[in-house]
């Protein structure tokens, strides 16, 4: 990863020897001060990546097998699963190669390792960017389906959805390539941070507006049936809880990584920031956790998808 704190892990593994590190401990930063460092065991990292990989493969297979799921909404969900799959797979590949290099089971020249590192970085960052974009696309799709229900099928067509998908993938690959090439430029890192904040604000505004519409709808039904206010309050509380969980998971899983990028620009040499940089692998692990949670939030809640997945699993046996 071309970000301070990762220190080109593949290249560094060529001349390194494996050392046992505690999962949670105190480490000395550049000034000798003590700071908290969370070390993620390789076995745990690979296990989380494998869980994410299996989950998202199942989502992609289920959507591909069922023609009823070939709609714009499921198109975005499928692409989100594919992005999360690539995030997990690329990080697992990098970790596996590092372990093989450190164990001496894999011999490679520095130039070859450099090229492999660049390829993995492009895949990782492009899939991260596309994952964020598809989360935003899903929010926009749901917003249109609620506020423009009668015109939804004319606004959000499958052809337009595929154009959006193609644009997201092309933009993600191009920007990630630029990011790898100019990772030491503050402007590039700040663009990534601004992009994350823009996605966070977009999702928050759209989902809050949808929650307000749901509360108004519930209030109208309650008045129609002459119910009391608590029924409306129950809908509001349930919706608020769902919204808090959705945005909270998004912020907690992605926020630390983009905080890392922000601090790389603002205080690359400060002792406190140096302590945070030491937890870069923890921030990557949180993104892997988000890739595990995404199918639970956006895919597996669909009864149609669950039925298809059940059929696929039964047929495989």
Swiss-Prot record:
Example GO BP: adenylate cyclase-activating G protein-coupled receptor signaling pathway
GO cellular component entries: plasma membrane
A single GO molecular function term of this UniProt record: melanocyte-stimulating hormone receptor activity
Extracellular topological domain residue ranges: 1-37, 94-118, 184-191, 267-279
SUPFAM superfamilies: Family A G protein-coupled receptor-like
Keywords: Cell membrane, G-protein coupled receptor, Glycoprotein, Lipoprotein, Membrane, Palmitate, Receptor, Transducer, Transmembrane, Transmembrane helix
Localisation per UniProt entry: Cell membrane
Lipid tethering residues (S-palmitoyl cysteine): 315
Glycosylated residues in this chain: 29
Predominant localisation class: membrane
SMART domains: 7TM_GPCR_Srsx
Protein's UniProt keywords contain Transmembrane helix: yes
Protein name, as recorded: Melanocyte-stimulating hormone receptor
Species this protein is from: Semnopithecus entellus
């Amino acid at each position: 990863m071309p970000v301070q704190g990762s220190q080109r892990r593949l290249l560094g593994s060529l001349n390194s020897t494996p050392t046992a590190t505690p999962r949670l401990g105190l480490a000395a930063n550049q000034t000798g001060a003590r700071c908290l460092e969370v070390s993620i065991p390789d076995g745990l990292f690979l296990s989380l990546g494998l869980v994410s990989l299996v989950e998202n493969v199942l989502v992609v297979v289920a959507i591909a097998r069922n023609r009823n799921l070939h709609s714009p909404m499921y198109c975005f969900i499928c692409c989100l699963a594919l992005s999360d799959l690539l995030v997990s797979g690329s990080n697992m590949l990098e970790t596996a190669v590092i372990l093989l290099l450190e164990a001496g089971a894999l011999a490679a020249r520095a130039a070859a390792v450099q090229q492999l590192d660049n390829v993995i970085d492009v895949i990782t960052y492009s899939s991260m960017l596309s994952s964020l974009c598809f989360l935003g696309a899903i929010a926009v799709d749901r917003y249109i389906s609620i506020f423009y229900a009668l015109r939804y099928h004319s606004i959000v067509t499958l052809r337009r959805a595929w154009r959006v998908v193609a644009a997201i993938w092309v933009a993600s690959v191009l920007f990630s390539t630029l990011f790898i090439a100019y990772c030491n430029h503050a402007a590039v890192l700040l663009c990534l941070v601004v992009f994350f904040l823009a996605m966070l604000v977009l999702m928050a505004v759209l989902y809050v507006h949808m929650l307000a519409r749901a509360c108004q709808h519930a209030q109208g039904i309650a008045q129609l049936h002459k119910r009391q206010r608590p029924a409306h309050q129950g809908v509001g509380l349930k919706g608020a809880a769902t919204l808090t969980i959705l945005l909270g998971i998004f912020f907690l899983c992605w926020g630390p990584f983009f905080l890392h990028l922000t601090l790389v620009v603002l205080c690359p040499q400060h002792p406190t920031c140096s302590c945070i940089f030491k937890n870069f692998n923890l921030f990557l692990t949180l993104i892997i956790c988000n890739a595990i949670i995404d199918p639970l939030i956006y895919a597996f809640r669909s009864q149609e998808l669950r039925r298809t997945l059940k059929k696929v699993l039964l047929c495989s046996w």
